[in-house]
């Protein structure tokens, strides 16, 4: 089961346009790292207090949106796919104005 999850995680890729105008795929985590690098560079040494929540919201909201579309709004199925209980899913959907 863990091996299956790892293989599934490898499927989380992003298509990007490289310098030679070719579309390539790279792991989602690499795109997140690059976005964080860019964000931190823009801070120019200043501190920020809510980075965890900011990043979580940027990933969590679209993930919830897509999983709810995929499950056709079935919260029980969505919660199972996400590995969280349905009550937690409902709280998260409410947080983002989705439920």
From Swiss-Prot:
GO molecular function, one term: sequence-specific DNA binding
One Pfam family, short name: HTH_8
DNA-binding feature ranges: 75-94
UniProt keyword annotations, A-Z: Activator, DNA-binding, Transcription, Transcription regulation
Origin superkingdom: Bacteria
InterPro entries in the cross-refs: Fis_DNA-bd, Homeodomain-like_sf, HTH_Fis, Trans_regulatory_Fis
This protein's record includes keyword Transcription regulation: yes
Keyword Membrane among record annotations: no
Gene3D superfamilies the record matches: Homeodomain-like
Annotated function: Activates ribosomal RNA transcription. Plays a direct role in upstream activation of rRNA promoters.
Subunit structure comment from the entry: Homodimer.
Family, per entry: Belongs to the transcriptional regulatory Fis family.
Name of the protein in its database record: DNA-binding protein Fis
Organism of this sequence: Haemophilus influenzae (strain ATCC 51907 / DSM 11121 / KW20 / Rd)
Gene: fis
């Amino acid at each position: 089961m863990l091996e299956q999850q790892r293989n599934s995680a490898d499927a989380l890729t992003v298509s990007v346009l490289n310098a030679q105008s070719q579309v390539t795929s790279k792991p989602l985590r690499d795109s997140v790292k690059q976005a964080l690098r860019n964000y931190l560079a823009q801070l120019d040494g200043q501190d920020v207090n809510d980075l965890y929540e900011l990043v979580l919201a940027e990933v969590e909201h679209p993930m919830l949106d897509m999983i709810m579309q995929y499950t056709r709004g079935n919260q029980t199925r969505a919660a199972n796919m996400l590995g969280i209980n349905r009550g937690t899913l409902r709280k998260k959907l409410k947080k983002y104005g989705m439920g």
